[in-house]
Curated annotation (Swiss-Prot):
Cytoplasmic topological intervals: 1-7
Region entry Xylosyltransferase activity, spans: 67-342
Family: In the C-terminal section; belongs to the glycosyltransferase 49 family.
Chain ranges passing through the membrane: 8-28
Cofactor(s) the protein needs: Mn(2+)
Gene3D superfamilies the UniProt entry points to: Spore Coat Polysaccharide Biosynthesis Protein SpsA, Chain A
Gene Ontology CC annotation, any one: Golgi apparatus
Keywords, in A-Z order: Glycoprotein, Glycosyltransferase, Golgi apparatus, Manganese, Membrane, Metal-binding, Multifunctional enzyme, Signal-anchor, Transferase, Transmembrane, Transmembrane helix
Entry's Gene Ontology BP terms: protein O-linked mannosylation
Name of the featured protein: Xylosyl- and glucuronyltransferase LARGE2
Sugar-modified residues: 50, 77, 201
Taxonomic path: Eukaryota, Metazoa, Chordata, Craniata, Vertebrata
Domain of life from the UniProt record: Eukaryota
Amino acid sequence: MLPRGRPRALGAALLLLLLLVVGFFLFGRDPEYGLGTTATLDGDPYGSRNRSTSSLQLLLPPKCEMLHVAIVCAGYNSSREIITLMKSVLFYRKNPLHLHLITDAVARNILETLFRTWMVPAVVVSFYDAEELKPLVSWIPNKHYSGLYGLMKLVLPSVLPLSLARVIVLDTDVTFSSDIMELWALFGHFSDKQVVGLVENQSDWYLGNLWKNHRPWPALGRGFNTGVILLWLDRLQQIGWEQMWKLTAKRELLTLTATSLADQDIFNAVIKEHPELVHPLPCVWNVQLSDHTLAERCYLEAADLKVIHWNSPKKLRVKNKHAEFFRDLHLTFLGFDGKLLCRELFGCPNQFPPGVEQLQQALAQLDEEEPCFEFRQQQLTVHRVHITFLSHQPPPPRPHDVTLVAQLSMDRLQMLEALCRHWRGPMSLALYLTDAEAQQFLRFVETSPVLSARKDVAYHVVYRDGPLYPVNQLRNVALAQALTPYVFLSDIDFLPAYSLYDYLRASIEQLALGRRQRKAALVVPAFETLHYRFSFPNSKAELLTLLDAGSLHTFRYHEWPQGHASTDYTRWREAQAPYRVQWSADYEPYVVVPRDCPRYDPRFVGFGWNKVAHIIELDAQEYEFLVLPEAFSIHLPHAPSLDISRFRSSPTYRDCLQALKEEFHQDLSRRYGSAALKYLTALQQSRSRA
């Protein structure tokens, strides 16, 4: 697997090198800085504070020493930021990492799934509940936009394991352009009394001269910025850090109403009183791009940059002389394929996450010359998954509520706005995207008034990996994240009737599915139009008129009639009440089922039989199929996907699909015994007809 990803990784490395060269010409030739002098801020009263790391003799840690990093992360936005931060760290790192993540419930749910599916070697992740820390800092008034989470770095020494001696603490809005090992090595320059390493604040905030009557917290000179911190934890315990910062904060709050910069104000107040505790770090380890930054005095040339800190509320939109260069560096990692960072640290033992070695062994046993190799490989692929990629407000619990579940790729984004107009209830959608496409999708939603207004739609990004579309894996991701008792298993190219959401909830209640524990799959009849523009029917009566006029058709009536034949459209035309239908070969209706229904079979990738296998599973588990008389959904025309084109043109593709069908039936026989015989018989009959 490594040789296949190497050209892409090399390309990304060359792009970063190009950015550094451009930066040299941007910064290195500017006479304001000069190439032969050391960058300082106002004469650098601490001497070594602003020296580039290259001017220090680094005491690098052993090759396989574990480096510990602590990050406070809460909410949906920070959960996206931390991924870009980690990409930049992983790109340069040469040491194993142990991440200590202080998270709320939202971030933990997202990041546990992400790191479990990312499967990066030599990375250990531990989680700590931020809710348990809130009482420790909730007494501190804070005006900073980060709220209570912005104060939690103060209590890290009492939260992290006692066995942990040192830790690097990072904000989520920083980007590395160097090996984090070099930052860790700066612990070796601490004196015996120094317990915290910080970069000087690169603005005049703590000088109190930014505007009239500006009264900041006390600080030593310009003060220090806490976006990047080296904490010597056992020394902090020895000096009574908890009592020290609390006494300082309580004293200052007698005259200052609140903190403005969260933990940073309190760190600076303590350092003002105890300057011997701080070890000033070279400024290049925290180049701060705030609204009033003086950071350009720090860097001499692009190669000096170690960490970029987007510490303005405006983030990437901040005004800065060299903002475009910094943004390009950040955007490089934003769109970088995270799969390419799953490389081994050669020579370091015990570095694989659980399951990786077994997966590698299974992949190694595959024969690349075998005709169905792509199918076998895709089945074994573990995709990175970022659940709830955007802000999400779950609906309040209701006993008969229904979530629409679907999956899509980048070429179907245009369906989302129409779908939101048709379906008023919650949705759980899985999107198959590259890292770069995920950022395009983010901007697409943010700029759409329709999509940005819908907070009950949960988007889950499954990152692309492999040549075949993992349709059932995507469905399972979306299904697993549905929060309502029932789910409508649909496809992205279908628009449901405007009234379908309310009608489904009413039908579930009338049929008493919940009270009777009835195993039922409610069938939503599927239709299609071949016109890109048509008047969507508001009722069953209008739909029948369009059907009779030839503007609508039963779904796939001319290509795959057996797929929906059991729905019995002739009976549906006159039906006034739900009616039961029997399973038949190749039946694949769109159904409403309980959330805990069987999952889709992930072996089916690409085109063909992915829904059919799921309906067989429902029938094998004795679900009854009930067709709803007033429900309908209409498929809109679109260009054929790559997978359906391959299915139509490649005999090998069709042979591989047939092999998957046979394996599926063998598994059915093992699980259901003689009850599964009817499915195998139906398969053999359909094969003889073909």
